Amino acid sequence: MDMQSRIRRLFEASIETKQQAMDILAPHIEQASLVMVNALLNEGKMLACGNGGSAGDAQHFSSELLNRFERERPSLPAIALTTDSSTLTSIANDYSYNEVFSKQIRALGQPGDVLLAISTSGNSANVIQAIQAAHDREMIVVALTGRDGGGMASLLLPEDVEIRVPSTVTARIQEVHLLAIHCLCDLIDSQLFGSEE
């Protein structure tokens, strides 16, 4: 197969996964946006975590809220727990890599805050511990997962929201996670500041 054919095949796979996910995920994304808006209206904040590409997604989400998405508006409170290398390495060195997010949540999280927990497999141990810490702090969890939801899915409470991408391919899951994050940002803005359409 030549390279351009391979590229087309990858585009087609991404489009197909998004089409399959659209109707399945729309109600979950809507519910997650309502949870987030309610928290923001009640002086809560967003915390976000993940590993690797999911860490990048956590930072992307937080930056869109703190700065802006597609319109001028006030900054919204969001913290990516993936960015402070001194904190991450000190916790990993002194305790365990599994605690790099949970210790931050115990310090920063407050009742009514929301944790955006991201893992393509749903089995990242440090994200699982982050969910447990968020529940201990009476936070609500929005989980971006894939495959069968992994260990994260089994920890979620009725008030939590799982956005589970119907795919087993990591790259396709990540692509839909990014789209879901953009949908959340758009819905948060439109609910808080009105629709621009």
Swiss-Prot record:
Protein name listed in UniProt: Phosphoheptose isomerase
Cofactor names from the entry are: Zn(2+)
Q: How is the cofactor bound?
A: Binds 1 zinc ion per subunit.
Q: How does it assemble?
A: Homotetramer.
Q: Where in the cell is it found?
A: Cytoplasm
Catalyzed reactions per annotation? 2 D-sedoheptulose 7-phosphate = D-glycero-alpha-D-manno-heptose 7-phosphate + D-glycero-beta-D-manno-heptose 7-phosphate
The UniProt entry's GO CC annotations, sorted and at most eight, read: cytoplasm
Q: Gene name?
A: gmhA
- GO aspect biological process, one term: D-glycero-D-manno-heptose 7-phosphate biosynthetic process
Q: Which family does it belong to?
A: Belongs to the SIS family. GmhA subfamily.
Q: Which GO terms describe its molecular function?
A: carbohydrate derivative binding; D-sedoheptulose 7-phosphate isomerase activity; zinc ion binding
Record carries keyword Cytoplasm: yes
**SIS domain location:** 36-197
Q: Does the keyword Metal-binding apply?
A: yes
Record: residues binding Zn(2+): H60, E64, Q174, H182
Organism source for this protein? Answer: Pseudomonas putida (strain ATCC 700007 / DSM 6899 / JCM 31910 / BCRC 17059 / LMG 24140 / F1)
Q: Which Gene3D superfamilies match?
A: Glucose-6-phosphate isomerase like protein, domain 1
Sorted keywords for this record are: Carbohydrate metabolism, Cytoplasm, Isomerase, Metal-binding, Zinc
Other notes on this protein?
A: The reaction produces a racemic mixture of D-glycero-alpha-D-manno-heptose 7-phosphate and D-glycero-beta-D-manno-heptose 7-phosphate.
